[in-house]
Amino acid sequence: MSLTADLARAQAKAATLIEALPWLARFAGSTVVVKYGGHAMVDPELRRAFAADMVFLRYAGLKPVVVHGGGPQISSMLDRLGIDSEFRGGLRVTTPEVMDVVRMVLVGQVGRELVGLINTHGPFAVGLSGEDAGLFTAVRRTAYVDGQQVDIGQVGDVESVDVTAVTDLIDGGRIPVLSTVAPGTDGVSYNLNADTAAAALAVALRARKLVVLTDVPGLYANWPDTSSLVGEITADDLAKLLPSLQSGMVPKMEACLRAVRGGVPAAHVVDGRVAHSTLLEMFTSEGFGTMVIPA
């Protein structure tokens, strides 16, 4: 390669760094809660890219906190064990048998793998679950299908959050990685929807942003019309749109709505199938995905 071509490549890299400068200045010292899920969890290259993104945020002066789901891995393990599973209203029906698998996969597999990937870049990540240090307390929830309330078993909503353990880790320069299993006040363990848990944590931490990784480019106002992709939407407009959304997007957009109405300045849904999507959202002028802002 010629010297001119090498210089052009170097200048392009420098231009990218300079473009990020105002965003680095704006978000320095800010807490960012990132919900990790979808295809980004199952593709090896995307997993490595996500881990690198979190370390980049840490070195750039931000305070990333990761809340992960594990839907694909849970489904795979249930299939291997011959345990039937179903979804109602976008949420997994969680029997006691399914709950055992959920805990095993989230805490023992997905969380540990992500911690390991992040720590290939340095001793940053520490794994926690909602059962540790009273982080989350859950309350049983139901789902709605066609306007009817239905039972979904040991699925919980977040009743309370104690961020002491998380803030201690952040203050120590660590990257907390949270699995969403939590005890209820009734003594039963619950499977928290990771989107819901991420929103509650973002509010409790007074985070600057909530970023939710999905398997679509963002929110569509009129799915499957791909021209209806929404770049930015207010909380009030999102609340009006929620009843018409596809069931899989409802928990994600509800989480964004809860976060913004709880005081988080902005919540974002980004396409986790695109490598470094979190950085594209945080540090480019164009942004990426759909941003939810207060009314």
Curated annotation (Swiss-Prot):
Which keywords describe this protein according to UniProt? Amino-acid biosynthesis, Arginine biosynthesis, ATP-binding, Cytoplasm, Kinase, Nucleotide-binding, Transferase
Q: Which reaction does it catalyse?
A: N-acetyl-L-glutamate + ATP = N-acetyl-L-glutamyl 5-phosphate + ADP
Q: Where is this site: Transition state stabilizer?
A: 35, 252
* Associated pathway: Amino-acid biosynthesis; L-arginine biosynthesis; N(2)-acetyl-L-ornithine from L-glutamate: step 2/4
**One Gene Ontology molecular-function label:** acetylglutamate kinase activity
Residues noted as binding substrate in the record, renumbered to the chain: 70-71, 92, 191
User: Could you say which EC number(s) this protein's record lists?
Assistant: 2.7.2.8
How would you classify this enzyme at the top EC level?
transferase
Pfam families according to UniProt: AA_kinase
| GO biological process per UniProt | arginine biosynthetic process via ornithine; L-arginine biosynthetic process
InterPro entries attached to this UniProt entry: AceGlu_kinase-like_sf, AcgluKinase_fam, ArgB, Asp/Glu/Uridylate_kinase, Glu/AcGlu_kinase, NAGK-C
Q: Name one GO cellular component term.
A: cytoplasm
Give the location in the cell. Cytoplasm
Q: What does this protein do?
A: Catalyzes the ATP-dependent phosphorylation of N-acetyl-L-glutamate.
Family of the protein in this entry? Belongs to the acetylglutamate kinase family. ArgB subfamily.
Q: Please report the name of this protein according to its UniProt entry.
A: Acetylglutamate kinase
The source organism is Salinispora arenicola (strain CNS-205)
Q: Which gene is transcribed and translated to give this protein?
A: argB
